[in-house]
Amino acid sequence: MTNISLDKLVTESRNENTKNIDRVETLEMLKMINDEDKKVAEAVEKELIHIAKAVDKIGEAFFNGGRLIYVGAGTSGRLGVLDASECPPTYGVSYDLVRGIIAGGQSAMFKAREGAEDSKKLCIKDLKNINFGKNDILVGIAASGRTPYVIGGLEYANGIGATTISVTCNPESEMSKIANISIAPVVGPEVITGSTRMKAGTAQKMVLNMLSTGAMVKTGKVYGNLMVDLKATNEKLVERAKRIVMQATGSKREQVEKILKETNFDVKLSIFMIESSLDKIKAKEILDKNKGYIVEAIKEIS
């Protein structure tokens, strides 16, 4: 356990603006919460340089066969699992490429297991169980920046030569000193003292959105602002796939449906086939050569 006392942590300090939140009308209470929430995006903005460095490292790792692994406890762990779980349906990647690990295991997603966060060894064990290696990226998430479970993971990852990133909401935390890249949006005291699921959790979610989205953009999973590697696994996504191809190419629905059927709903390939007027085999060959970047593939045939 780190020797940083809780009373020195910004996330544990008392918010002067909400001291009477229990004595006001409902609307005023919600205005207090909303006013505090407005500070979150500004805090994240101040960390954009560090977030950009992290995104570049993650994209580089993906190209080298590495993965993005989130570790955290409680709310922080759940946010990592949430972000990771959205990547496969959105970007068509494997469930192994971006993974979230929460202290205490799967059951901790639904029922708090607070004691699990106090063990450094537990995180090391969890990382070994997924064969975490030096080509992978470890993102440690903890509002306080002092959670032993996460610190143990960062120390282990550093020890094997992997890139480490910390996402905290306290300046100069122990985690920020351990990680190769520190991202620390300081959102100030919480509306309810110490309830870091609120502003700190929102800030962490915003940062994780940027990390995963940025890395996917950097690795060709997005064309314009369209998710061209999504998997059409249900009716909503089938319809979205059609709309994406129509928006990207300006083609009529009938043509798009025909091409998507031919490519087995490979959105990216369908777009490039229409844009290039190439058959499926040749279009796939050029796309693969350009690592899935539609823009680069179009340049090659221009």
Curated annotation (Swiss-Prot):
GO BP terms: amino sugar catabolic process; N-acetylmuramic acid catabolic process; peptidoglycan turnover
InterPro entries: Etherase_MurQ, Glucokinase_regulatory_CS, MURQ/GCKR, SIS_dom, SIS_dom_sf
E.C. number: 4.2.1.126
Keywords carried by this UniProt record: Carbohydrate metabolism, Lyase
Catalyzed reaction equations: N-acetyl-D-muramate 6-phosphate + H2O = N-acetyl-D-glucosamine 6-phosphate + (R)-lactate
Pathway(s) this gene product operates in, as recorded in its UniProt entry: Amino-sugar metabolism; N-acetylmuramate degradation
Active site: 86 (proton donor), 117
Gene3D superfamilies hit by this protein: 1.10.8.1080, Glucose-6-phosphate isomerase like protein, domain 1
Domain SIS: 58-221
Listed CDD domains: SIS_Etherase (cd05007)
SUPFAM superfamilies, sorted: SIS domain
Note: A lyase-type mechanism (elimination/hydration) is suggested for the cleavage of the lactyl ether bond of MurNAc 6-phosphate, with the formation of an alpha,beta-unsaturated aldehyde intermediate with (E)-stereochemistry, followed by the syn addition of water to give product.
Family that this chain belongs to: Belongs to the GCKR-like family. MurNAc-6-P etherase subfamily.
Function: Specifically catalyzes the cleavage of the D-lactyl ether substituent of MurNAc 6-phosphate, producing GlcNAc 6-phosphate and D-lactate.
Subunit-structure text: Homodimer.
Record's protein name: N-acetylmuramic acid 6-phosphate etherase
Species this chain originates from: Clostridium botulinum (strain 657 / Type Ba4)
